[in-house]
C-alpha cells in the first residue's frame, strides 16, 4: 500500500517538474551518496511502516471477526437463524478462505432446511481443509438422510481413517453396507465393530442378525437375536425374527417358533405375516384347526396380495 510522504518525494518532484538542467546535474552528482545512505534508510523506514500498518490491519480484522463471531453465537442461541446466516456471510466476506466459517454456515443451512446449500458449503469446507472431521460427519449424516448410503459410507470411512479412536463410526460403516443390502460386507463390518465396541455387543448382534436373516443364514441369525433377547424380550419385531428363525432351521423347532410368533402377534408386529408363519408351524405340529384360524385372519386383515394368494391356496388344500 502506498503512503504519501512530503519529504521523500524530493527527487521525484524535481524530475516531474522539469527543473533547470543545472539543478538536475547537481542532484545527479549527489545520487551515489544519497542512494547509499538516505534512500537505504528510507526503504527500511517504509518497510517498517508497512509492516506496522499490516499488523495493525490484521489486528483490526481479527477484532472485527471476533466481534462478529460473538454476535453470530448469540443469534444461534436465540434460534434467529436467518440473522445468523447474514452474520456468517459477513464473516466470509472478511475471510473467504476460512473452512470453519463454511462449516458454520453449512450447519445453519441444515437448521434452515437448505440441505443442498449445506452440502455445497461442506464440499467447500473439505476442499479448504481435507482433514476437518466434523465436516465429514455432517455431510455423511446428510447423505444418509437422503438415502445416499454410498457417499455416506465413503465419508464414514474417511472419518475412521482420520481418527480410529472414534470406534463408534464402525457401526455407521456397517449400517451403510446393510442399507445398500451388501450384507456380507455389513456382517464383516459388524464383526469389526463388535471387537472394538464390546459395550455395544447386544445391539451389534441384533443388527448383524438382521443381515444374516436376510441371507437366510437362520442358524447364525438366531444366535445373534438370542444375544439381544434379554435387552427387550417383549419387542414385537425381535420375537417375529426369532420365531421365523426357529421355523426356518434345517430341523425346524416349531413349538419354539409358535411361542415367539405369538408374542410378536400380541405386540402388534406384522400380525398378518406372523399369523401366516404361525399357521405354517401349526400345520407342522398337526394343529390344523389353529392353522386355519391363523390363515383366515390373514385373509381378513392383510393388504399383501401375494401373501393372501399363498394363504388362500393353503386354505383350499385344508378344505379338501
Summary of predicted features, one role per range:
Residues 98, 132, 166, 200-201, ...:
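Residue-level recognition of tetratricopeptide repeat
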Residues 94, 128, 162, 196-197, ...:
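Structural marker of alpha-solenoid helical repeat scaffolds
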Residues 104, 138, 172, 207, ...:
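Canonical tetratricopeptide repeat
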Residues 101, 135, 169, 203-204, ...:
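TPR alpha-solenoid repeat register
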Residues 90-91, 124-125, 158-159, 192-194, ...:
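Canonical positions in the second alpha-helix
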Residues 77, 111-112, 145-146, 179-180, ...:
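Register position in tetratricopeptide repeats
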Residues 58-100, 104-111, 141, 175:
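Alpha-helical segment of the N-proximal tetratricopeptide repeat
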Amino acid at each position: 500500500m502506498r503512503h504519501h510522504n512530503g519529504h521523500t518525494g524530493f527527487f521525484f518532484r524535481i524530475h516531474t517538474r522539469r527543473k533547470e538542467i543545472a539543478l538536475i546535474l547537481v542532484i545527479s552528482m549527489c545520487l551515489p551518496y544519497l542512494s547509499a545512505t538516505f534512500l537505504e534508510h528510507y526503504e527500511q523506514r517504509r518497510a517498517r511502516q508497512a509492516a506496522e500498518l499490516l499488523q495493525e490491519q490484521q489486528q483490526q480484522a481479527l477484532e472485527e471477526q471476533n466481534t462478529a463471531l460473538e454476535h453470530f453465537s448469540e443469534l444461534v442461541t436465540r434460534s434467529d437463524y436467518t440473522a445468523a446466516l447474514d452474520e456468517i456471510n459477513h464473516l466470509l466476506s472478511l475471510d473467504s478462505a476460512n473452512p470453519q466459517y463454511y462449516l458454520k454456515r453449512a450447519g445453519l443451512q441444515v437448521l434452515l432446511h437448505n440441505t443442498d446449500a449445506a452440502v455445497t458449503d461442506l464440499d467447500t469446507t473439505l476442499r479448504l481443509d481435507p482433514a476437518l472431521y466434523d465436516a465429514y460427519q455432517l455431510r455423511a449424516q446428510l447423505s444418509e438422510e437422503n438415502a445416499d448410503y454410498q457417499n455416506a459410507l465413503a465419508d464414514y470411512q474417511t472419518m475412521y481413517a482420520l481418527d480410529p479412536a472414534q470406534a463408534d463410526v464402525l457401526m455407521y460403516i456397517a449400517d451403510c453396507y446393510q442399507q445398500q443390502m451388501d450384507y456380507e460386507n455389513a456382517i464383516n463390518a459388524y464383526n469389526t465393530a463388535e471387537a472394538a465396541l464390546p459395550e455395544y455387543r447386544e445391539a451389534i448382534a441384533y443388527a448383524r442378525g438382521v443381515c444374516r436373516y436376510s441371507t437366510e443364514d437362520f442358524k447364525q441369525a438366531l444366535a445373534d437375536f438370542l444375544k439381544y433377547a434379554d435387552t427387550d424380550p417383549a419387542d414385537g419385531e425381535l420375537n417375529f425374527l426369532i420365531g421365523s428363525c426357529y421355523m426356518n432351521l434345517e430341523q425346524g423347532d416349531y413349538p419354539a417358533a409358535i411361542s415367539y410368533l405369538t408374542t410378536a402377534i400380541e405386540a402388534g408386529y406384522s400380525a398378518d405375516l406372523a399369523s401366516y408363519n404361525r399357521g405354517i408351524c401349526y400345520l407342522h405340529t398337526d394343529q390344523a384347526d389353529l392353522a386355519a384360524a391363523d390363515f383366515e385372519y390373514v385373509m381378513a386383515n392383510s393388504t399383501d396380495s401375494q401373501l393372501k394368494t399363498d394363504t388362500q391356496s393353503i386354505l383350499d388344500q385344508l378344505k379338501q
